[in-house]
């Protein structure tokens, strides 16, 4: 998904599609609609294509793509959802470590029982994608929804690699917005 990027993301997708990776499909947004909406668009597309499962991974090359085989093995063993769990936060600066820890702690305090240190790096079966498709809300919090499905799940630990190019666009404000979306779309605790 090219979420309205200003770099060469779309050009790379087009080039990959035409050469050795004809199976690569790309979706392009005209502007940045945000991480969750981009992921949902990609998952809806995969579901329409009739996939058995889908894996989401960030394009910044920090998540270990060699672990996808382990995700698929766990899927073949019967897991409907396989979470990518960061082994540690060594690659994060102090502020990112603190905000990451606070994010998961706060979300769980608010009643969104999410798996600590899992990112958007995950495998979802067709059954999990069908479950997601039943949600008609516009602001979905995927980390909460998938943890709440009751479907059989497992996890794969991975090391976060150093960022090769550029800086993360996921700022403290982005993390705050994600937490707010998670609380307002997934937790009833603030209403009590």
PLM region descriptions:
Residues 1, 72, 78, 190-192:
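Short, intrinsically disordered, charge-balanced linker/junction segments flanking boundaries
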Residues 8, 12-15, 41, 70:
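Alpha-helical transmission elements in cytosolic ATPase-linked domains
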